[in-house]
Amino acid sequence: MCFTSCSNKGGKLEEIEKQVNKIALNTANAEPIYKLYPTRNMWNFLKLDTRNGKISIVQFSVEDNEKQFEYELSNKALCENNAPGRFILQPTENIYNFIMLDQMSGQTYQVQWSFDEEKRFVTPIQK
């Protein structure tokens, strides 16, 4: 954006332009609120709310809309009112397990996804 073609009393327009550009740059570099992580099952992803650690399982299909769904894996927020990018997921060698890292506290969690609701969980890894 350029405001300098307008009247510029006291250099205020340049200052406003600098502030707008700074906000635009910060917004462009901002961490996303949600991230999709592929699983080794080609039809399934984990959707992570990077602010609070909530996770859902997302399945897509190229043939049938009834095979598309999103299920909650963990609907419990691990923290409140945090900035995007706090939590990340790292895949493991096990197809159903990920490690979740709280990048602020260093706490790690074992995340297990499954089609069977009883086998889904997020649990802290003890230090």
Residue ranges and their predicted role:
Residues 7-9:
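Bacterial signal peptide processing site
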Residues 43-50, 97-103:
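Short beta-strand motif characteristic of blades in beta-propeller domains
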Residues 57-85, 123:
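A low-complexity, Ser/Thr/Gly/Pro-enriched, surface-exposed linker/loop concept
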